[in-house]
Amino acid sequence: MNKPLAAAPNDWLADTHQPENLSHELCDYNLYTEDAALTAAVVREGGQWGAEALSVFGQACGTADYLALGRQANQYRPELDTHDRFGRRTDQVNFHPAYHQLMDTAIRHGLHASPWTEPGPGAHVVRAAHTYLHTQVEAGHGCPITMTFAALPTLRLQPELAQLWEPGITARHYDCLLYTSPSPRD
């Protein structure tokens, strides 16, 4: 009969060297105030009135806990559920809670609509800077935020559609539930 091989952890781990030239994890810093090019561009392009809010947002985005949300949202990929447990077609995509937290923050801070709801000089600059800071944490959620932002000018070309959809599009409350749009036949 074969006898299991007894091995100690050091038997399979190579003893090489102690690395000394590695950087530390970049966290717990202000993504806005530490970015000289961004802070200068915001002022140059007329968004200086938003610098304080950008600084607060940059500090929040740069915390270790918040940066971890970005890693989690990428580590745990969305999962497609094509059918429910009874076999009915659902075609629902399920996202990790970290993704929803990132989306919630983006919506609450108006990354999806602030220049449309609070227009003025530099409004697009401040919104772009907020978006730039937030997508450094995780870029994937930037797509639905940007598509939502881009939808409103097009909808406003048809006032009856804008009247129907604009309140929901510009709302500062994130709703992670899946909704289906009305059928064209209804």
Outline where the language-model segments fall.
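Extended, charge-enriched "interface" segments that sit outside catalytic cores
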Residues: 2-120
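Conserved small/polar residues in nucleotide/adenosyl-binding loops
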Residues: 179-186
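Internal helix-loop-helix
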Residues: 77, 83-175
